[in-house]
Regions:
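Residue immediately N-terminal to the catalytic "proton-acceptor" Asp
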Residues: 48, 53, 68
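Cytosolic eukaryotic protein kinase-like domains
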Residues: 1-33, 66, 70-199
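Protein kinase catalytic-loop region centered on the HRD/HxD motif
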Residues: 37-50
Length: 199
């Protein structure tokens, strides 16, 4: 048996955010929407629901039209309850939690069960990284201050100080673009709030 995948000639989002390539504000917005739609499908369109568990820039692939596709489902979990039936609580019976540092919810390290909320958290961190250009593992983030707290403390008044300058250079800054960027940052902050998923 062989698996055949669609060619993704534009590589991963990681390459566009942290190498020599530049993404415009519009492209970043489109990619964010594509990822949100993919997560909505996994969490609400699949039967049973699937939690990706490893959403990060290197697992987002871009096709020839710069449409984002979520890939690498090696850590994904199907949401079943202990009896083997689909979970109605949105929690899984699995305690084996893996993922990428900086993107995985801190609650998973405290024994919380896997939940779609974990993917929402990872999506929020990913949005913040897309707009700031800073990895969540940046050395700037110490003493309990992560990318979430960093952005939250600067919004909305100092948003222009935290925006990745390459996105603004590629297509210029306007009030409309800045408003769009601030909205994306606010969504990223809202999604990456630490929420304990109860047992």
């Amino acid at each position: 048996m062989a698996l055949v995948f669609e060619l993704m000639p534009n590589g991963s989002l990681e390459n566009w955010l942290h190498e020599s390539r530049n993404m415009s504000v519009g492209q970043r917005l489109d990619v964010g929407i594509d990822i949100a739609l993919a997560l909505d499908y996994l969490h609400n369109g699949c039967e049973p629901p699937i939690v990706h568990c490893d959403l990060k820039p290197s697992n987002v692939l871009l096709d020839e039209d710069m449409v984002a596709h979520v890939g690498d489902f090696g850590l994904a979990k199907v949401m079943f309850d202990i009896s083997g039936e689909q979970s109605t609580t949105g929690q899984s019976s699995s305690y084996a939690v893996k993922g990428s540092i900086g993107y995985i919810p801190p609650e998973y390290g405290m024994g919380s069960k896997i939940s779609p909320l974990g993917d929402v958290y990872s999506f929020g961190i990913l949005l913040l990284e897309m707009i700031t250009g800073m990895r969540p593992t940046n050395n700037l983030f110490t003493d309990g201050i992560g990318i979430h707290e960093y952005v939250m403390n600067l919004l909305p008044d100092n948003a222009s100080d935290i925006i990745d300058s390459t996105s603004l250079r590629s297509d210029g800054t306007t009030d409309e673009k800045l408003e769009c960027i601030v909205s994306m940052l606010e969504i990223g902050v809202a999604c990456s709030v630490k929420i304990l998923v109860k047992e």
